[in-house]
């Protein structure tokens, strides 16, 4: 009998030791609530402490990329909750909105603790257009954090998701490059762009009569916001854009506009450019003669063509654009000829500069798209030539890190 008791005690002691070892190996919080978990000296600060990081811009992006999974609450979501855009995007946005473990806190007008301060304090605005911005890991935020003064969203008309609280016959504007891969739940124009822009501007425009944009150290700079029309129903798309997505920004005075009475352009925090298959008729743009909102103001500007800068009616545009291939053809060149030289020669730069100058004389800024981005040395040579020799106002850029490094 004593032998049985002895073996029983031995087995209990053996299993207890085994359980302690397993608990230490798998990181369990405790052993049946009896033996507390040993403190981990290498444990990173919780996600909540990120509110005091003090780093901004591209450094902030790299910090999140390198440390995302190290922070409490960032490596997993509660229950069955799934990432909306991605774990990276969702966690980054929660940091910006000062809400690491729950819904965003009510926005307060406090420039020093604003989203704008977290993103762009000590960031120099650069003459860059964030091409295909909606493809980036952090749409809108990534371009702004690098100082890009222009962004872009491709939009499609899409039926409301079945779980929405609105009638099924209404539509939303989904953001994406290809209609097949649209996500009308998470990737919408208001979710990715107009909503965050309104939140950012609300936090820094505290004093009436004082305008502040998305760049903390250059609050007077506007953000060019390209809306690329993808759906064939252009008039409906424009109506949705104006009625549902831009009106909240207009109501708060955040949109650049052309005064149809005084014939003056008034710059504000966001300048909307229509590109792609947008309506060409100003009667549609202005909804008649008194402006779309019947206030004698034009809030959306048609993209002009560098090769025909005066083809549109005066004051219909603020930016003209052309592909590099069209400019090369106009000047009697092709891409192969400049690739072999590694840059544009004097004759070509003189020709393109004359075209750029025509746009400038018409009061238009300029952007050239379709510029090769490889080899890297060739791409950077063309960037320098666009800015220094041609006078291009917006560089069309995919690689934001590389572009930021040359300014």
UniProtKB/Swiss-Prot annotation:
Keyword Zinc: no
PANTHER family: ALTERED INHERITANCE OF MITOCHONDRIA PROTEIN 6
Family of this protein: Belongs to the AIM6 family.
Originating organism: Zygosaccharomyces rouxii (strain ATCC 2623 / CBS 732 / NBRC 1130 / NCYC 568 / NRRL Y-229)
Name of the protein described by the UniProt record: Altered inheritance of mitochondria protein 6
One MF term in the entry's GO annotations: phosphoric diester hydrolase activity
Signal peptide positions (record): 1-23
Listed InterPro entries: HAT_RTT109-like (IPR051236), PLC-like_Pdiesterase_TIM-brl (IPR017946)
């Amino acid at each position: 009998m004593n032998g049985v008791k002895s073996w029983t005690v031995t087995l209990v002691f053996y299993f207890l030791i085994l359980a302690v070892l397993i608990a230490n190996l798998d990181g369990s919080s405790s052993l049946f609530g009896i033996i507390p978990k040993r403190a981990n000296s290498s444990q990173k600060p919780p996600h909540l402490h990120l509110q005091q990081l003090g780093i901004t811009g591209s450094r902030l992006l790299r910090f999140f990329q390198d440390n995302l999974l190290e922070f409490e609450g960032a490596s997993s979501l509660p229950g069955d909750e799934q990432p909306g855009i991605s774990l990276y995007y969702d966690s980054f946005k929660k940091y910006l909105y000062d809400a690491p473990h729950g819904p965003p806190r009510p926005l307060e007008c406090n420039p020093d603790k604003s989203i704008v301060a977290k993103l762009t304090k000590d960031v120099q605005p650069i003459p860059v257009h964030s091409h295909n911005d909606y493809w980036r890991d952090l749409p809108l935020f990534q371009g702004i954090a690098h100082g890009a003064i222009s962004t872009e969203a491709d939009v499609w008309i899409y039926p409301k998701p079945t779980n929405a609280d609105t009638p099924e016959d209404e539509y939303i504007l989904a953001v994406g490059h290809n209609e097949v891969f649209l996500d009308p739940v998470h990737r919408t124009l208001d979710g990715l762009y107009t909503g965050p822009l309104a939140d950012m501007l609300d936090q820094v425009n505290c004093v009436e009569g004082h305008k502040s944009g998305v760049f903390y150290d250059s609050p007077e700079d506007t953000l060019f916001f390209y809306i690329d029309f993808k759906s064939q129903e252009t008039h409906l798309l424009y109506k949705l854009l104006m009625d549902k997505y831009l009106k909240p920004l207009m109501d708060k005075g955040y949109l650049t506009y052309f005064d149809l009475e005084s014939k003056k352009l008034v710059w504000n925090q966001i300048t909307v450019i229509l590109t792609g298959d947008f309506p060409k008729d100003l009667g549609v743009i202005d909804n008649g003669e008194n402006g779309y909102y019947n206030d004698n103001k034009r809030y959306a500007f048609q993209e002009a063509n560098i090769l025909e800068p005066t083809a549109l009616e005066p004051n219909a545009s603020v930016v003209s654009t052309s592909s590099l291939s069209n400019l090369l053809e106009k000047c009697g060149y092709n891409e192969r000829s400049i690739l072999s030289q590694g840059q544009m020669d004097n004759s070509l730069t003189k020709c393109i500069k004359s075209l750029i100058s025509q746009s400038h004389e018409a009061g238009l800024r300029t952007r050239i798209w379709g510029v090769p981005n490889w080899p890297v040395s060739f791409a950077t040579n063309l960037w320098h030539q666009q800015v220094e020799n041609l006078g291009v106002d917006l560089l069309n850029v995919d690689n934001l890190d590389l572009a930021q490094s040359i300014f």
